[in-house]
C-alpha cells in the first residue's frame, strides 16, 4: 500500500512539471504568434513615413588575420554590433508570464542592411546569421560574426618602418538618411557612445607582423550629398620591422661592407673583381625578393628599395673603380707614361692624408763596391810590343763597371802617353758599358712600374675612405628619415 502511494505521488509531481513546461512553451509561442501576426519584415519600423529609424553600429575585433600589401587587402575577424528599436515588437511581460526577451531568427525581423562598403571580394553578406535578441521594449540587438576582406590603401614610402590606416566603411545598402540614421553603439551600461573598435581581449589574437596603435571610429557625411551617411572604423596599425631588419637590412649592410672592403683587397690577389660582382649579384637578388612584397605603385618608392638601390649603385661603382685600379696597377713604362699631375697628386700629395708611407729603399750589403788590392808597379795595359806602359801606384780602388772606362782614360791621359787600346779590351769595355746601361734601364723600368703600382694602391685607399663615408652617411640618413615616421597621436588632427 505504501508503495502505491509513493508511485501515485511521483506521477502527480511529474505531471505538474510537464504541465508547467508546456505552459511556458505555449506562452512563448503565443507571444510570437501575436507579435508576428501582422508583422512584415520588409517594412521599415517607422510609425510615420517621416520618422527615421536610428541604427547604432559598433564593431568588435577578435583577430587581425592578415594585411596583404601586394593586393592592398586587410582580412579581419569581427563581430558587427547592430541595435535599433522596432515598435512592432513590444509587449507587456506581465501578460506573458514575465517573458522579457525573445531570440528570433534574423530573417524573421526587419534588418537595416548594414554592409561593408569597401569590401575587396564583392561579398556584402554576413558570414553567420545568428538570432537577434528582442526585448519587450522593442529594442533589437544583433551581433553577427564575419570575416571581412576590406580594401586598404598601402603607403609604401617607409616600408618596412611604415604604419597603415585601414578603414572599414559601414552604411545601409538600401536606405538613405531620410529613412535610416546611423549612430555609434552604446556601452554595456547604455550611457555613452563607443567611438572606437572594441577588442575582445578573451578571444583576440595578436598579429605577429602588425601592432594596433589606434582604433577610432567616426560618423561621416557629405555636404554635397545630404542623403549619404556612414560609420567608418579606422584601424591604425604599425609594422613590426624585426623580420625585415634581420633578413634584409642587416644582410644589405654586410654586403655594403664587402663592397667597401673590395678596395682593401690587393690587386695581386686576383679576387678583386669576383668579390665586387658577387656583391652586386647579392644586392640584385634582395631587390627581386622585395619586389614581391610591396604593391606595384608609382606613387612612391619604399625606403628599403631606396636603400637597396643606393647599395647597388655603390657596388656598381666599386666594380667600375676596381677596373680602374687594376688598370693602374698593371701599367708599365712600355705602355703608359705617367703624367706629372698624377705623380704630384697620388705620389706626393695624397699619401700623407691617407696614412700611407712609401718604404724608403736602402742599399743592401751585396751592392757595395768590391775592394781589391793591386801591388806596386803593377801594369795592366800592355803595348803591342809586349812591355807595360802604365804603372799603377799601390792603392785600393773600387771596381765599378760604370767608372771603369773613365779610370782607364785617366790612367792613359794622366800617367802615360796615349796609347791605342787592343780590340779585345775595347769590346770588353763596350760590353761592360752595355751591361751597365741595361742594368740602369731595368732599374728605371722597375721604379716606374712600382710607381704605377703605388698610384693604384693610393687610389684604392682613397676609394676605400670615400666609399666608407658615403655608405655611412647614406645609411644613417635613410634610416634616420624612417625613424620620424610614427603614427599620429590624434588620428583626426
Swiss-Prot record:
Residues 329-461 are cytoplasmic. The keyword Nucleotide-binding does not apply. Coiled coil: none annotated. Its main location: membrane. It is a multi-pass membrane protein. The chain crosses the membrane at residues 241-265, 273-291, 307-328, 462-480. Residues 25-240 are extracellular. Disulfide bonds join 152-166. Glycans are attached at residue 165. The modification Phosphotyrosine is found at residue 379. One of its GO terms (molecular function) is transmembrane signaling receptor activity. One of its GO terms (cellular component) is postsynaptic membrane. It is found in: Postsynaptic cell membrane; Cell membrane. It catalyses: K(+)(in) = K(+)(out); Na(+)(in) = Na(+)(out). After binding acetylcholine, the AChR responds by an extensive change in conformation that affects all subunits and leads to opening of an ion-conducting channel across the plasma membrane. Pentamer of two alpha chains, and one each of the beta, delta, and gamma chains. This is Acetylcholine receptor subunit beta.
Amino acid at each position: 500500500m505504501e508503495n502505491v502511494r509513493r508511485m501515485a505521488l511521483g506521477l502527480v509531481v511529474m505531471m505538474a512539471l510537464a504541465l508547467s513546461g508546456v505552459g511556458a512553451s505555449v506562452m512563448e509561442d503565443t507571444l510570437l504568434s501575436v507579435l508576428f501576426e501582422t508583422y512584415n519584415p520588409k517594412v521599415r519600423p517607422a510609425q510615420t513615413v517621416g520618422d527615421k529609424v536610428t541604427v547604432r553600429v559598433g564593431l568588435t575585433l577578435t583577430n587581425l588575420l592578415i594585411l596583404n600589401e601586394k593586393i592592398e587587402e586587410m582580412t579581419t575577424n569581427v563581430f558587427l554590433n547592430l541595435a535599433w528599436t522596432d515598435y512592432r515588437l513590444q509587449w507587456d511581460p506581465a501578460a506573458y508570464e514575465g517573458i522579457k526577451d525573445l531570440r528570433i531568427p534574423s530573417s524573421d525581423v526587419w534588418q537595416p542592411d548594414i554592409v561593408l562598403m569597401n569590401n575587396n571580394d564583392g561579398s556584402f553578406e554576413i558570414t553567420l546569421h545568428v538570432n537577434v535578441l528582442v526585448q519587450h521594449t522593442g529594442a533589437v540587438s544583433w551581433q553577427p560574426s564575419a570575416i571581412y576582406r576590406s580594401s586598404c590603401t598601402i603607403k609604401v614610402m617607409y616600408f618596412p618602418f611604415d604604419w597603415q590606416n585601414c578603414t572599414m566603411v559601414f552604411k545601409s545598402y538600401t536606405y538613405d538618411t531620410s529613412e535610416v540614421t546611423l549612430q555609434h553603439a552604446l556601452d554595456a551600461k547604455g550611457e555613452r557612445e563607443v567611438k572606437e573598435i572594441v577588442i575582445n581581449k578573451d578571444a583576440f589574437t595578436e598579429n605577429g607582423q602588425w601592432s594596433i596603435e589606434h582604433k577610432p571610429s567616426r560618423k561621416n557625411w557629405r555636404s554635397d550629398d545630404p542623403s549619404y551617411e556612414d560609420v567608418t572604423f579606422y584601424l591604425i596599425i604599425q609594422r613590426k620591422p624585426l623580420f625585415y631588419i634581420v633578413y634584409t637590412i642587416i644582410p644589405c649592410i654586410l654586403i655594403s661592407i664587402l663592397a667597401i672592403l673590395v678596395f682593401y683587397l690587393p690587386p695581386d690577389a686576383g679576387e678583386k673583381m669576383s668579390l665586387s660582382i658577387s656583391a652586386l649579384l647579392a644586392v640584385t637578388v634582395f631587390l627581386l625578393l622585395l619586389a614581391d612584397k610591396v604593391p606595384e605603385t608609382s606613387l612612391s618608392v619604399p625606403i628599403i628599395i631606396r636603400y637597396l638601390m643606393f647599395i647597388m649603385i655603390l657596388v656598381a661603382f666599386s666594380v667600375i673603380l676596381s677596373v680602374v685600379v687594376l688598370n693602374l696597377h698593371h701599367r708599365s713604362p712600355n705602355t703608359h707614361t705617367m703624367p706629372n699631375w698624377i705623380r704630384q697628386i697620388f705620389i706626393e700629395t695624397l699619401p700623407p692624408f691617407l696614412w700611407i708611407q712609401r718604404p724608403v729603399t736602402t742599399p743592401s750589403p751585396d751592392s757595395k763596391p768590391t775592394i781589391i788590392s793591386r801591388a806596386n808597379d803593377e801594369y795592366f795595359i800592355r803595348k803591342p810590343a809586349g812591355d807595360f806602359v802604365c804603372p799603377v801606384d799601390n792603392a785600393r780602388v773600387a771596381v765599378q763597371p760604370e767608372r771603369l772606362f773613365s779610370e782607364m782614360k785617366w790612367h792613359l791621359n794622366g800617367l802615360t802617353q796615349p796609347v791605342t787600346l787592343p780590340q779585345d779590351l775595347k769590346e770588353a769595355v763596350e760590353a761592360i758599358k752595355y751591361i751597365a746601361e741595361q742594368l740602369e734601364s731595368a732599374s728605371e723600368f722597375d721604379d716606374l712600374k712600382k710607381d704605377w703600382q703605388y698610384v693604384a694602391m693610393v687610389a684604392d685607399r682613397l676609394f676605400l675612405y670615400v666609399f666608407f663615408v658615403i655608405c655611412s652617411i647614406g645609411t644613417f640618413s635613410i634610416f634616420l628619415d624612417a625613424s620620424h615616421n610614427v603614427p599620429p597621436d590624434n588620428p583626426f588632427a
